[in-house]
């Protein structure tokens, strides 16, 4: 059966239900059975789209299919070619597709063939920062720090799995029952996590954290209310004065964004080595070496861990080592690097407070497999880490530095901290936004001497209350 015959067969139902919908409006009023007709109309439209999509793929030359699967391909040229094939298929079957649906059909076909199907427009929307797919019928986005449910849907689970396969195949991975979890990265740098049944009971789930091409600057973050000018000046002095900094916060709190801002203060004359699971940092300095971990292949071989990268980075004559996130035993190697001449290093950690960050570092060092006494671990942390910056995502979706604390040493077996700056919450205004003020504790940091040794003098009025 030709494409035209298949489309016309499907279109009979489409036209009949349109007429039925119009009749129901005339007979039963504005509501009638129009909703039912609209649903069948949409179902028929999706069936027609699927037929044309299958026809285009079948007719597409094999060499063009191979080019499409390559992330490095010229997307503008591919779009032009696929757009032409879509237009030809519609032109050859003009009675199957109503005129009003043709432009939408071409765009959706291009998204199906070149992009990620129905979620492609969400990925192109600059106001969307995260896309969360909880099965084929439930898709959420994060916009301006708030979660919103969309009316976007996949046709069915098979359609969603087809898009998932496209994502993981592009990075040489697979996802199936034997390997139901995958981390990947899109061509634009966005991070993707996939988990499928039997682990996910609600169906295949995809979480995409979009890669921002517009790097936030200090001025922008001050404008957004993430911190104030005094805190920015202090953090700039800390970076230029080669203090070791840990940025702490929960998931989605803006740790990597803040680390990127802090990294911008590193002098251009220094050699920086960045280590990440998924490359997100966008440093503007010239002398930057970016290293990325590698998961094991299908046979379970070839894995390169963060610990491997930290150890290798120490042999690369770095002036600064910046670890995107410490999660496990690499914390021990990072602390040793901080304690052995690599001052000015920075990393992030998942924790809800500065005190919790210290506990997390202890736990991560224990995960290295080294049987060290707890006091020795705490002593290592106290001598390596100078500043902990705590950032949080608040109820209104805003991200703020809620605390900057200095590690001052040890008293007995306890690592001591002192707060330097903090955010005082004043409540919620009539628009639902959290209000407050950034304040100083009035205490002058003990790291003043270390800063002075590196040519940085803190302004005397920086800590006046």
What are these regions (language model features)?
Residues 125, 133, 138-241:
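P-loop NTP-binding catalytic core
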Residues 255:
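Conserved lysine of the Walker
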Residues 65-66, 91-98, 114-125, 167-184, ...:
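Active-site phosphate-binding and catalytic loops of NTP-dependent enzymes
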Residues 212-223, 260, 264-311, 357-361:
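P-loop NTPase switch/communication element
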Residues 276, 281-289, 313-410:
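Conserved P-loop NTPase nucleotide-binding/switch module
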Residues 1-148:
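N-terminal anchoring/assembly modules that precede and organize ATP-driven motor systems
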Residues 247:
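Hydrophobic anchor at the beta1->P-loop junction of P-loop NTPases
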Residues 397-465:
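NTP-binding/hydrolysis catalytic cores, primarily Walker-type P-loop NTPases
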């Amino acid at each position: 059966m030709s494409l035209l015959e298949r489309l016309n067969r499907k279109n009979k139902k489409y036209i009949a239900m349109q007429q039925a919908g119009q009749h129901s409006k005339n007979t039963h009023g504005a509501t009638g059975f129009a909703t039912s007709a609209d649903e069948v109309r949409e179902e028929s439209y999706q069936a027609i789209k699927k037929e044309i999509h299958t026809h285009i793929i079948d007719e597409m030359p094999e060499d063009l299919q191979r080019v499409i699967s390559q992330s490095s391909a010229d997307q503008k040229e591919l779009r032009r070619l696929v757009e032409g094939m879509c237009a030809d298929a519609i032109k050859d079957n003009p009675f199957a597709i109503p005129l009003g649906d043709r432009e939408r059909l071409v765009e959706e076909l291009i998204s199906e063939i070149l992009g990620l199907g129905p979620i492609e427009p969400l990925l192109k929307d600059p106001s969307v920062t995260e896309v969360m797919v909880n099965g084929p019928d439930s898709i959420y986005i994060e916009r301006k720090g708030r979660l919103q449910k969309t009316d976007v849907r996949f046709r069915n689970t098979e359609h969603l799995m087809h898009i998932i396969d496209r994502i993981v195949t592009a990075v040489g991975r697979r996802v199936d029952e034997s390997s139901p979890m995958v981390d990947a990265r899109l061509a634009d740098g966005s991070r993707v996590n996939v988990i499928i049944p039997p682990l996910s009971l609600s169906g295949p789930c995809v979480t995409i954290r979009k890669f921002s091409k517009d790097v936030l600057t200090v001025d922008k973050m001050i404008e957004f209310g993430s911190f104030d000018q005094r805190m920015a000046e202090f953090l700039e002095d800390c970076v230029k004065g080669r203090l070791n900094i840990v940025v702490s916060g929960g998931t989605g709190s803006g740790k990597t964004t803040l680390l990127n801002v802090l990294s911008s203060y590193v002098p251009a004359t220094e050699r920086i080595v960045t280590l990440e699971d998924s490359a997100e940092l966008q440093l503007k300095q010239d002398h930057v070496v970016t290293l990325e971990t590698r998961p094991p292949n299908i046979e379970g071989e070839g894995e390169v861990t963060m610990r491997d990268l930290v150890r290798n980075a120490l042999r690369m004559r770095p002036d600064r080592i910046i670890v995107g996130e410490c999660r496990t035993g690499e914390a021990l190697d990072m602390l040793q690097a901080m304690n052995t001449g690599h001052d000015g290093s920075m990393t992030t950690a998942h924790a809800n407070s500065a005190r919790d960050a210290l506990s997390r570092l202890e736990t991560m060092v224990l995960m290295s497999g080294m049987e060290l006494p707890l006091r020795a671990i705490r002593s290592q942390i106290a001598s390596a880490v100078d500043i902990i910056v705590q950032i949080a995502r608040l109820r209104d979706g805003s991200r703020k530095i809620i605390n900057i604390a200095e590690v001052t040493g040890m008293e007995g077996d306890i690592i001591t901290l002192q707060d330097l700056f903090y955010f005082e919450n004043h409540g919620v205004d009539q628009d639902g936004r959290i209000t407050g003020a950034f304040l100083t504790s009035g205490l002058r940091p003990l790291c003043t001497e270390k800063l002075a040794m590196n040519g940085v003098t803190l302004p005397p009025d920086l800590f006046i209350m």
